[in-house]
């Protein structure tokens, strides 16, 4: 039974704007370390017994993907290029069709390319348990115990019965709740954050996809069968692909399947999906600030300040995010940074070049 890692790398990372842009989104940036996020994701695979990875990304990122993987001595990954963004459901479907063509009993382990994990060895233990369950035809997701009412994550309710606390049966998904709802979910105690890491047999996923999201299944099957192939590179056929609905893996399958299981992940995980999440992840000074670049802060607490090109000075600030780049300065309340995505949408509507 092959175990094949699938790296999802097609997102645009709009909530980390203005650092993350369409042409160079956060997975290709060194946001949390000197290496880029996709490089860190692939390097974590060293702790696990995997076959060569499958990377799924947009066609526009072709050269970036190959260049960054070559830099870490990954010379021959399988790469699937999507003509357009369609979210994680179709992306995983394309990888599942490819993995099934290698080995009809293969297990795929899906990793977003833009998350950070401090403890790769604990991740490997959770993945090993997930692969055991996947071998029993279960559909597994790794869940993280919530530490605060984050509104940018999906939440998963579990049936609390477990013989050894290594896995739980999945009950329901809750899509990105508001703060009041998130607080209530945490207090109940039987909810996890969805880490975005999924483990299942390719054929089991495709069977469930055909059952619950047939439009994705049938059109991806056509796009895959008509794909252009060269060496380890596969370009999905555009006409069929464009008929595929935009859909997350949660909405496509995980909300409906009766095979869902949750394996707890305690490995210092963060999806770095917002400036608040990045502030939460990084080391702080004695005033709980993250100060990066040419920055001076006076009487400032609980803030994130990044200066890329100029001196940035903060005086008397609390819970503030300041991000200075060559062409944009973002100033936001740290508790409102989820709304950065709305700013990007408005700029895109106005066709402003700052989104590129």
Map each language-model feature to its residues.
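Short beta-strand segments
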Residues: 7-9, 56, 109-112, 141-145, ...
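Conserved beta-loop-beta/alpha segment of the NTase-like Rossmann-fold superfamily
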Residues: 74-161, 199-200, 206-213
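A short, charged helix-loop
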Residues: 158-192
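Residue-level signal for inorganic ion chemistry
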Residues: 28, 38, 95, 114, ...
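A residue-level structural signature of the nucleotidyltransferase/glycosyltransferase Rossmann-like core
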Residues: 54, 108, 197-198, 270, ...
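Left-handed beta-helix
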Residues: 1-2, 203-356
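Conserved N-terminal catalytic core of the sugar/cofactor nucleotidyltransferase
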Residues: 1-7, 14-22, 30-112, 116-121, ...
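Short loop-to-beta-strand entry elements in the cores of soluble alpha/beta enzymes
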Residues: 191-202
């Amino acid at each position: 039974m092959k175990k094949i890692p699938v790296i999802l790398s097609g997102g645009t990372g709009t909530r980390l704007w203005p650092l993350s842009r369409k042409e160079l989104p956060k997975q290709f940036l060194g946001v949390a370390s000197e290496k880029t996020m996709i490089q860190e994701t692939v390097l974590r695979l060293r702790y696990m017994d995997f076959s060569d990875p499958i990377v799924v990304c947009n066609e526009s990122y072709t050269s970036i993907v190959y260049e960054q993987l070559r830099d870490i001595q990954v010379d021959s990954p399988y790469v699937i290029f999507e003509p357009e963004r369609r979210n994680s459901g179709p992306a995983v479907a394309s990888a599942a069709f490819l993995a099934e063509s290698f080995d009809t009993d293969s297990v795929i382990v899906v990793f977003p390319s833009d998350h950070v994990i401090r403890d790769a060895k604990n991740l490997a233990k959770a993945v090993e348990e997930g692969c055991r369950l996947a071998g029993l035809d279960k559909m597994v997701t790794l869940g993280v115990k919530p530490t605060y009412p984050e509104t940018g994550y999906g939440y998963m309710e579990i049936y609390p019965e477990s013989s050894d606390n290594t896995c739980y049966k999945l009950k329901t998904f809750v899509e990105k709740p508001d703060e009041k709802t998130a607080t209530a979910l945490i207090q109940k105690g039987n909810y996890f954050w969805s880490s975005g890491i999924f483990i299942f047999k390719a054929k089991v996923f495709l069977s469930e996809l055909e059952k619950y999201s047939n439009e994705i299944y049938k059109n991806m099957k056509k796009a895959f069968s008509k794909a252009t192939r060269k060496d380890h590179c596969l370009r999905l056929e555009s006409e069929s692909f464009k008929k595929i609905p935009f859909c997350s893996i949660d909405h496509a399958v995980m909300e409906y399947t009766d095979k869902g299981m949750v394996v707890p992940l305690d490995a210092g995980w963060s999806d770095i999906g917002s400036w608040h999440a990045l502030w939460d992840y990084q080391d702080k000074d004695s005033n709980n600030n993250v100060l990066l670049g040419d920055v001076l802060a006076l009487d400032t607490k609980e803030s994130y300040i990044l200066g890329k090109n100029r001196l940035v000075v903060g005086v008397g600030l609390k819970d503030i995010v300041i991000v200075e780049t060559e062409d944009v300065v973002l100033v936001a309340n740290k508790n409102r940074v989820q709304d950065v995505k709305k700013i990007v949408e408005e700029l895109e509507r106005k066709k402003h070049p700052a989104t590129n």
